[in-house]
Curated annotation (Swiss-Prot):
Protein name: D-alanine--D-alanine ligase
Residue stretches in coiled coil: none
Cofactor(s) this protein requires: Mg(2+); Mn(2+)
Taxonomic lineage: Bacteria, Pseudomonadati, Chlorobiota, Chlorobiia, Chlorobiales
Pathway membership, UniProt: Cell wall biogenesis; peptidoglycan biosynthesis
Role according to the record: Cell wall formation.
Record GO cellular component, one term: cytosol
């Protein structure tokens, strides 16, 4: 039986570029070589597509160690230097010419998780892993996600949405609007970034200007959100028409909240699978996750995050990630493993779910 040719697409123009490479490396190691021929396609920070040669070299880097021992900026410079020294011609994006039959997407964040690459691949009639255009775009925007799931009867944290232009036009007015709505502490978040990039927990007025400046420098829209107390609970959802929900996992942050450095550099958070909440609450979380998955029109996969306060009995949806991380410390593959899907089985299932969506 001939092997199916898979384009493993990674890198990209987002601030999560390096995490995307680490995810792709994990996926490459777990796709069956007997059933699939993997062609790595690397997108540089500047948006240039590179195939095979340099793409494979970058895939083999130990970026996890580089991030731990230096900084995201140093890692980005090292990658750009590799590309420059390779002097490889860009890939011409003719997927059919090299026999690509399906794409495995490990692009995190802007330009990869927000519906843009999905729309491009739909135009090329190339099936791909994960959600389609609409669900990808919708879940990328934290403000729109809240509106959609709240309409389905799912609890979300109280929030307001601001435009960066409003902040730059009248900073004091924005400060006043926020303080009229919330008591400290609260969160300031870019609306369209992942991996907790640009998120600040603001404990007092002196921290507010820097938090807003940081978020506004990264996105044209920001979300200011009430700080919810409770355990951080995550579930993985896998499937198209008949999705399955994993066991619940729990994250105990090593810092004030589970931010980028806690996730990928310090690695100080503690993970618990199953989560340390009563069985009946786990069942309710899983039920709400499935409801959200369907309300948002998801397919393929998503990781859905909650805040759970067992004393009050409250379950609040935090966010939905349509291309979750596949690194060694990522919750999605761990949750699926705890639910009976080994990493190779998970990679196989995701590719099969992608192929199911192929239109004649």
């Amino acid at each position: 039986m001939p092997r199916i040719t898979v384009a493993l697409i990674f890198g990209g123009r987002s601030t999560e570029h390096e995490i995307s490479i680490i995810s792709a490396k994990s996926i490459a190691a777990n796709i069956s070589a007997e059933r699939y021929k993997v062609i790595p396609l690397y997108i540089t920070h500047q948006g240039t597509w590179l195939c095979e040669g340099i793409a494979r070299d970058i895939l083999n880097l130990d970026l996890s160690a580089l991030l731990r021992n230096s900084s995201p900026e140093a890692a980005a410079m090292a990658l750009d230097r590799m590309v420059e020294e390779a002097e490889q011609k860009p890939f011409n994006l003719d997927f059919r010419a090299i026999g690509i039959e399906v794409a495995f997407l490990t692009l995190h964040g802007t330009y990869g998780e927000d519906g843009r690459i999905q729309g491009f691949l739909d135009t090329c009639n190339i099936p791909y892993t994960g959600c389609g255009v609409l669900a990808s775009a919708l879940t990328m925007d934290k403000a729109l996600t809240k509106l959609c799931v709240a309409d389905a009867g799912i609890a979300v944290a109280p929030s307001i949405t601001l435009l960066s232009a409003e902040y730059h036009a009248d900073t004091e007015k924005v400060h006043s609007r926020i303080e009229e709505k919330f008591i400290y502490p609260f969160f300031v978040k870019p609306a369209n970034l992942g991996s907790s990039i640009g998120i600040s927990k603001v404990h007092h007025r002196e921290q507010l200007p820097a938090a807003l400046k940081s978020a506004c420098s990264l996105d044209s829209k920001i979300v200011v959100e009430k700080a919810i107390t409770g355990r951080e609970i995550e579930v993985a959802v896998l499937g198209n028409d008949e999705p399955e929900v994993s066991v619940c996992g729990e994250i105990e942050p090593g810092s004030d909240f589970y931010d980028y450095h806690d996730k990928y550099i310090h690695n100080s958070a503690k993970l618990f699978i199953p989560a340390r909440i009563p069985d009946e609450m786990q069942s309710e979380v899983r039920s709400i996750a499935l409801k959200a998955y369907k309300a948002l029109g998801c397919r393929g996969m998503s990781r859905i995050d909650f805040f759970v306060d067992e004393k009050r009995g409250t379950i609040v949806l935090n966010e939905v990630n349509t291309i979750p991380g596949f690194t060694d410390i990522s919750m999605f593959p761990r949750l699926m493993a705890a639910s009976g899907h080994s990493f190779p089985e998970l990679a196989e299932r995701l590719l099969q779910l992608a192929l199911e969506t192929l239109r004649p």
